[in-house]
Structure formats: structure tokens, C-alpha cells
Amino acid sequence: MKRMRLIIPAVLLCAILSGCGAPAANVNQSLPVSPASLSYNDLFSKATPLVPAMDSTFAMPTNASAPVDVFEGRLDLVNPSSSGSVVVLRDDYTAFYGNNSPWEHLTAFSFEFVQDGSYLIPAQQGLVYTGSEAYNYIVGPGRVWTQRGDSGYTRASFPFTLAGRNDNCTHNGEMTFLFSNSKSPNISNVRYQVTQETCAWAKFNLWGNIAATYTPYSVANDATIKSNNENEVANRLPVKPLSALTTDYPNSGVILANIISDYQEKQDITTYGLYINGVNYVSGCPTRFGEYSYCSEMRLPTYSVTKSMFNAVAMMRLGQLYGSEVYSQLIRNYVPQSTHSAGDWSNVTFDNAIDLATGNYLSATYMADSGSPQMAAFDSAEDYSTKINDAFVFPNQAAPGTVWVYHDNDAFIVNQAMNSYLQQQQGSGADIFNMTRNDVYTPIHISAGFDTLRTDNSATGKSLGDTGLFVTQDDMAKIGKLLNNDGGKIAGSQILDPVRLQETLHRSPALFGLPEIGTGANPAYYFNGFHAGHFTPATNPQYTCDFWVVAMNGYGGIVVALFPNGSTFYIASDNNEYGSIGALGESNKIAPMCP
């Protein structure tokens, strides 16, 4: 079964001005007690485990001894499509349709790893396309150690993510096993489990013990893989637990619970954090079986945050490289399918499209088009030819730049236009995502697994621009810092167009963007892929000045909010709750919004 990619935008203003939500699904299940450890016998046993283990079982103990063996080569799981157990907790679109659905099992797994001290590093990070009907993989760096009771074997574990095919949902898990360079067999079974997700429509526990093979050999570019991992880890932002806010700022009166007061269903929060005064204060990463062992490596979806974090940043990079005339380029000169559109694209600019103000829509009623069959067809289309044609089915209703209508397809179209523009400048091999990653994000030491969905379920497909980035806690905080604190500069060099960035942050005197239709008397504004809410003493008397909060928002409950005091609040959740009011208030206690 090929499942449709469902992108259903939420009430986006809630992420800026107020909290809102939907009833939580009942995900409580009665299960036997989960083991708190996995022994040598457990990992060599052929028995199917009755329940998932506690997730802390996959973590390297604080008193662990150094590894006695080195893992380098390929790890293969043997016939994963016939192994494991699943408990489905929520399945809004019947992905788990029975008859051995591919969603009930892992898909084929074959990955190379290298070891650097106690770090186990996958040779390929980022999104790995498997061809499965259900899942692709993202595999992150893990750890290697020895402990008593393992009969001379070395123990390894690592985090992995099941990313739905043509979808931005993430289902996070861990794997662990024993291995040896001198014993036979050279590897135990692999114990795996998936017990957490950021996915509003599908929730499940998936676990098992599966036979595996370990093929040792020297992995190509192993020294570079190790060096890159060392560099990325060394350049992460300073990090502390959120609880440290009360000790770092003892006189502020900060109340930790208020940071997420906009969110009623706390069990549906994956993780959140507040970057302030140079420190990334982070929550944990709770699962249904305790704390996730690799919180800093956990892959988080972005959905429509991609419109800001990728599309808008790419546009500002092009503006810095080639001048502000990029913004007024016409879509029709770069996307030939526009000439066969049901609408009128003759005068639609890059700016109009990234502002979601092309004038081509069915209805200006708030979010009506997002729920239309036409948008569903566009969102579910996987191959580029179908997707780009489905993007142009909306008729013309208004002049470009006059009416804001939330449209995934417009963001996709401008992404293709920017890609074509870049290829005209740099050659046919240029790619807009690769340029954005290499020019903007790699220099700030973004995680190696930072990646995007592409069309055709293929690494050679086109980037989307409307959805699809996969990030970590550190990634979100770093991107907030780049935009909100560093003015688009990296190591003293201006990387993003500074004028457009200030306009995007609403720190220029003029008002930019269009009001978001349906957001009330104090509307949010949308400009350059970002939402912005205006705070005044009249509307928010706790503040004595006028200021704007700019936010990136994504389906399910993804928010990255940039506050004018230089702090960034981010959260990944999946109960369709959105808000940053609580975080804004607590951040204000530490560093006032109004000088």
C-alpha cells in the first residue's frame, strides 16, 4: 500500500499569539513489565521479546569500560520483514491494514559503520531511501563499550528513525547488539525498538530480536567520517537541562512549567528547548518506555517549518549571492509547467510565491484550499512529473501579492523556480537544497543527518521546499541563532541578505507581508515564509513596547519562535497544539523584550 502524504496545516496563528489544540488520542496499553536491562543471554536468545525494554537500556552506562573491540564494516539485519511485534496506538489512515502490512516490520537494513573510540558512526547519515512501501531510514551516531556479563563481547547501540515514505513523520528507536573481532559468532542478535514518534496520525510500538550479520572491512573514507563526527560534536552549542534556568537565573522568577503552558497534552511533546544567552537549555526526550537514550541525536520532523528553514533561507542566500533582483524574478521563466496552469502565472514573482500570495487559489477562506481534494492530490503525489502538474491546478482569483492563501504547492513551485535559477547561475548540476546546506548550514556545523524529502522517493529527486526537513535540538537552536542573533553572518562573512532578513524579522520600520486571512482582529502576518505576530501594550499589557515575534510553524505541533530579546523557543509535538506565549513570558523574565 502506498500511503498518501498528508500535510494538513494547523491553525498557524496559535503558534504565535495563543495556544490551541485537539483532543489527544488514547494511547495507553496494558503491557507486561519492561526489562530494565538486556543481558548477554537476552541478546543471543532466539525468543521473541514480549514487550519493549526500557529505553535507558540502550544507553552507554556512566561507569562503562572502554570497548575492547573495534566495529568497522557492514551491519545487515536478516529478513526483517518477517520479524518483530507491533502494538498500534493510533492509525488515522489505516496504514496498518493487516495481512502482514509493511508498516508492521522494519524494512531491509544494511549500513556501514566506523568506530572512533567509544563512538559508532554510520557512514551514511541523512535520509536513506529503501524502496519500502512504508519506511525510509535515518541512522545516527551511537556508542560502543564493554560491561560485565557480556562474556568478552563488546556492546554497541545506536539511534535510528523510521521516516514514512513520502512523509515527514519520524518514528524514533534504538538498536543494540554484542560483537567481537575474535569470537564466533562475531555478532549477537540485534535488539531493536521504536517507542516514540512525532507524528500526529500514526503512533505505535515496534520491537523485536533479529538475526544479524557483521562483515568487517575497512570502510571508504573512514578517517573523514570520524573527523566530521568529531567536528560536529565539538561545535554543538553549549547545552544544559532546562532545569538549569532556575539556577543560572535564580532571581528571575522563571517558572519552568510555564514554558510549555500552551500545551495541554504533555505526553504528546517529543522535546523542546530555549536558546538564550548562548546556551541551549533542553528538555529530555521521553518515550512510552522511559527516556530516549540518544536525545541529542533524535530526528525531528519539520513539516511546514521547511517553508522558512529551507525556502526562505535559500531565497536570502540567493539574494546575497546575486542581488535583490532575484526576488522579482518571474516564476514562468523558470518553471515551464506554469504556462499550462489553470491559473495565471504570467506576473507571479518568486516573492509572491514564497509569500503564498500568487492569486491562484480556489477559496480565500482560511485553510479551505489546504483541505481540498486538489491539495490532497498534490501532497500525495510522489513522482516529479505528477507533482509539478498537480501544483498548477488552482485557478486565478486575484492579482499576485494581494491575498494570502496557505498553499503547499506555491512553496513547492518557488523551490523549483529557485533550483532552476541556481542552475542557470552555477550549472545544471546545482541543487537548491545542496547549496543551502553547503553554503549556510554546514558552516554552522549542522548535524550530519540534516536532510530533506525529495520527489520520486529518491536521492536524485527534486527537493520539496514545502515540507520535509529532518533536524535535531541543536539544529533548531543553531538556525534560530543564525537568524535571530547573528544577522545571517557566519565567521564574520555575510551569508544571507541582511536587508531581507531584517524585513523578515519585522525589525525594519516598514510593515512587510500580508495578513493571514481568518486570524482575527490582531492578525498574524506572513512574509518570506515566516509567520509574525505583533505585540503591543494595548493587546498585551504585560509588555510596555511594541515588538514582533516571528515563527516557523509545522503540522502537528512544530514551532520555532524567534523572540526579539535574542532567544529562540522550539518544540516538536504531535497533538495539533501550537503556542509560544508561555515561553515568551518566561524568556522575558530572563531578558526583557522591552529594554
Mark where each language-model region is.
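Penicillin-binding protein/beta-lactamase superfamily catalytic region
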Residues: T386-F392, A398-H407, S420-G427, F450-P564, ...
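Long, solvent-exposed N-terminal ectodomains/accessory regions
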Residues: V27-S180, S184-S188
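Active-site-adjacent helix/loop patches that line small-molecule binding or acyl-intermediate pockets
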Residues: T247-Y272, H340-I446, V471-A477, K481-N485
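C-terminal motif of bacterial Sec signal peptides marking the signal peptidase cleavage site
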Residues: I16-G19
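Structured C-terminal helix/loop/strand segments within mature extracytoplasmic catalytic/sensor domains
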Residues: S101, T107-V114, L127-T130, Y137-N251, ...
